[in-house]
């Protein structure tokens, strides 16, 4: 249990470090950013498919945005402040394809984070996932945009 807490603390620290702004870009105003880390290799998880869905009025999930993580394990530019309105969103990280590409048979098909966004006004969300073949851990950093 203590090692799990330490792992979560380290993950949260990495997220705070990445909040300073994406590496080498001017996308610090990105309202939704995803960061994926490989716990086995101790490195960013590169080229991981990420799909974002928004819950519709009829309770179904509608595709909202998608992309793949960069060399830094980050995915920016999923949406704009204007498009990212109040609602319930689901971030789905394709963990199976990532591990299969490394020759590993994983347990999970994907990692999933469902959250309510912008219900207290505009916010910026960083969703971070720490992956291993048989487990994953997620955390989020939610900040108020600076004008």
Curated annotation (Swiss-Prot):
- Which InterPro entries does UniProt cross-reference here? Thyroxine_BS, Transthyretin/HIU_hydrolase, Transthyretin/HIU_hydrolase_d, Transthyretin/HIU_hydrolase_sf, Transthyretin_CS
Coiled-coil ranges per the record?
A: none
Keyword field: Gamma-carboxyglutamic acid, Glycoprotein, Hormone, Phosphoprotein, Secreted, Signal, Sulfation, Thyroid hormone, Transport
Residue numbers of Phosphoserine PTMs: 72
Superkingdom per UniProt? Eukaryota
Q: What is its main location?
A: secreted
Task: Provide an example Pfam family for this protein.
Answer: Transthyretin
Which annotated residues bind L-thyroxine? 35, 74, 137
Residue numbers carrying Sulfocysteine: 30
Can you supply one Gene Ontology CC term for this chain's record? extracellular space
Entry's Gene Ontology BP terms: purine nucleobase metabolic process
- Sites where 4-carboxyglutamate occurs are at 62
- Which compartments does it reside in? Secreted
Q: Which family does it belong to?
A: Belongs to the transthyretin family.
Question: What protein am I looking at?
Answer: Transthyretin
* Organism field: Pan troglodytes
Lineage here is: Eukaryota, Metazoa, Chordata, Craniata, Vertebrata
Gene expressing this chain: TTR
């Amino acid at each position: 249990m203590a090692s799990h807490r330490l792992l979560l603390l380290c993950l949260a620290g990495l997220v705070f470090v990445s909040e300073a702004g994406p590496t080498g870009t001017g996308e610090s105003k990105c309202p939704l950013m995803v960061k994926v880390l490989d716990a086995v290799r101790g490195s960013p998880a590169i080229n991981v498919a990420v799909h974002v869905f928004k819950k519709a009025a009829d309770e179904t999930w509608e595709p909202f945005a998608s992309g793949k993580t960069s060399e830094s394990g980050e995915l920016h530019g999923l949406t704009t402040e204007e498009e990212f309105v109040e609602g319930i969103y689901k971030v789905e990280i394709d963990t199976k394809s990532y591990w299969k590409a490394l020759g590993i048979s994983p347990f999970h098909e994907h990692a999933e984070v469902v959250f309510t966004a912008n219900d207290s006004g505009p916010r910026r969300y960083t969703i971070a996932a720490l992956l291993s073949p048989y487990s994953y851990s997620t955390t989020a950093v939610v900040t108020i945009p600076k004008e």
